[in-house]
Amino acid sequence: MPDAGTPVGHGDVTQRVGVEVIRARGVDVEKLIKMLIANAAAEFASTYYYYTILRMHLAGYEDYKEICEDARLEDRAHWELIVPRIYELGGELPNDLPEFHNQAGCIAAKLPNPPTVVNILTVLLESERCAIRSWSAICVMTFGKDPRTYDMAARILNEEVEHEAWFIELLAHERDGKSIPSGHFRRGEPGEAPYSKNRRFYNP
């Protein structure tokens, strides 16, 4: 029987088979929980919140605002996807927002000074790159060992890679006058998150 060496006592609520199985396969569960909390903090506290401010300051660039809005809302969807997994693994979120913010795996995407469109796009781009590195690390850690966390991380990573491509395209055009196409598919609705919400793709 697969993973028969990870028994949990009948009616025991202090252990989780879903945790012991992946631990037996070599996952450092405590480290994984810390990484997921850091990524959750990055998606919510240092990205979703600050992207809201960045979007407001893309004045006069309605097309850029729309793309920023997709990234902003999809990062919120990522947050919603991560949190249940943290608790399933036996972890929990800090009961203090500043403490949670300080655990973020990426620096806060704060409004730059001066808040020019080029500076804002640069902040957005570097924020997405940090997210790609963070989720890639979790994919490597869980591949072949923890299919549930791996599937979640891979779905989020797919969208972060798209976000990076969007902001490369916009920044190259705005700052360098170059065309570096992202292959951007317009979302059917803002923040559709086709990977993390398992929705169909819409390509007009």
Indicate residue ranges for each PLM-predicted region.
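Iron-associated oxidoreductase/ferritin-like identity signal
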Residues: 1-204
